[in-house]
Design a protein with these regions (language model features):
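Zn2+-dependent metallopeptidase catalytic core
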Residues: 1-20
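Hydrophobic (often cysteine-bearing) scaffold residues that line and stabilize catalytic clefts
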Residues: 3, 60, 64, 83
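Hydrophobic beta-strand residues in large extracellular and virion-surface proteins
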Residues: 11, 21-25, 48-50, 63
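Catalytic zinc-binding patch centered on the HExxH motif and its immediate surroundings
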Residues: 17, 24-47, 56
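Short, solvent-exposed loop/turn segments at secondary-structure junctions
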Residues: 28-31, 54-55, 68, 94-95
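Short pre-active-site segment immediately N-terminal to the catalytic Zn-binding motif
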Residues: 44-63, 77-79
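Catalytic glutamate of the conserved HExxH
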Residues: 62, 66-70, 74
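Post-HExxH zinc-binding segment in Zn-dependent metallohydrolases
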Residues: 79-102
Length: 102
């Protein structure tokens, strides 16, 4: 399976909400946007755009961060500051947990 699928399986174990929506991961050039990734929500469709030229570790951390946002979408958490605080506070711990499982 792909790295993205492995990350999704890992995160689904912690965030069962992720299995209740459609998630599409789209590699794209986000250089001009100055971000590694973002999540767009449309009903129960969640599109994660992720920069197409990241190191493996940055890809893992970014996808984990964005999947936390998908979980927040399902939970109805809309406050941007709360959303980012939660995602940033968890991304490195979860990245290390994921890397230790591989």
């Amino acid at each position: 399976t792909t790295l993205g699928n492995q990350i999704f399986e890992f995160m689904s174990g912690l965030y069962p909400n992720l299995t209740e929506v459609d998630i599409e991961v789209i590699p794209t050039d986000l250089t001009e946007d100055n971000v590694f990734g973002w999540t767009l929500e449309n009903n129960d469709q969640n599109e994660i755009e992720i920069h197409n030229n990241l190191s493996e570790k940055d890809f893992i951390t970014t996808l984990i961060h964005e999947l936390i946002h998908v979980d927040q979408n399902v939970r109805g958490l809309r406050d941007d500051e709360e959303r980012e605080n939660e995602a940033y506070s968890l991304e490195h711990t979860l990245t290390n947990q994921f890397l230790n499982k591989c």
